[in-house]
UniProtKB/Swiss-Prot annotation:
Annotated protein name in UniProt: Potassium-transporting ATPase KdpC subunit
Membrane topology: Single-pass membrane protein
Source lineage: Bacteria, Pseudomonadati, Pseudomonadota, Alphaproteobacteria, Hyphomicrobiales
Keyword Isomerase belongs to the record: no
Functional summary from the UniProt entry: Part of the high-affinity ATP-driven potassium transport (or Kdp) system, which catalyzes the hydrolysis of ATP coupled with the electrogenic transport of potassium into the cytoplasm. This subunit acts as a catalytic chaperone that increases the ATP-binding affinity of the ATP-hydrolyzing subunit KdpB by the formation of a transient KdpB/KdpC/ATP ternary complex.
A GO CC annotation given for this chain: plasma membrane
Name of the gene this protein is made from: kdpC
Amino acid sequence: MFRQFRPALVLILATTAITGLAYPLGMTGLAQALFPVQANGSMIEKDGKVVGSQLIGQAFTGETYFHGRPSAAGDGYNAASSSGSNLGPTSAKLIDRVKTDYEAAKAENPAAEVPADLVTASGSGLDPHVSPEAAYFQVPRVAKARGMDETALRALVDRHVEAPELGFMGEPVVNILALNMALDAAGS
């Protein structure tokens, strides 16, 4: 009877060894050799301590920092709750949240049009980027709170605008964590 099960047993053990051990270890080794920063989560360090990842947004509050997109992933961009809100365009809850966020943003900068990404969450709820327009929209508030010149702050935002991937995929974006770290490093 064992002779009948032997080929199936050998096949399942070989498949398990290949797909469960050899392939994952090989890909991990290759990633560590070719892309060590990305393979380890694209971590950002300050004074030798990890302060975040280039790939996951953080909740910045207060007038002295640029704010990211609203997060549908719970408080503080909780990666364990990553996902969209699943609220449809006719959802009263979504409409109320967007109206509240819009009114708060409009009060902050009444002369400017509120960029959509400041009032809408991303699909994952963890997006670390905003559009350059969303960053520029926040310049007057941050400049006033930090006592900075708006022109200098706009120049800082300009330096943190990232081009689309490969020059043509997507739109220009600004990483909020990197921008806020540069803001702190500027000493204002």
